[in-house]
Amino acid sequence: TGSFQSQDKFKCFVSIAGISDFTKLLRSETFFRGSAKMNKIMHGDAFEDKEYLDSVSAINYTDKIKKPILLIHGTYDTQVPHNQSSMFYNKIKNSNDSVEYFEIPKATHYFDEQGNRFVMFREIERFLAENLN
């Protein structure tokens, strides 16, 4: 949310396995696999709370986000599907040419394997070096 609510405070943004569309995520099968009641308590209801969820979903503000963004997501993420990052990238790339999407094959939500963490941190380091000069 900082990318669209507090842009002036940052030079760039890094999103690691981030949620870009809360409503879509809560309506997906990923969140119906677990306890529906627990998901509603923790995250809200995708139908009853749609207005609020849309207001905190970055995908609805892509035209306002002008700072560089690095999106990193693992393809084996079972907590937040990697399409949350890819659909955000596909929408924002037309209005922000400083956005990068880096997908890490077989990486989980927590980047459990050391090799995946190394790749992730290497990309973050490169991106920050380029954008924080």
Describe the residue ranges of each PLM region.
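Active-site-proximal cap/loop segments of hydrolase catalytic domains
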Residues: 1-133
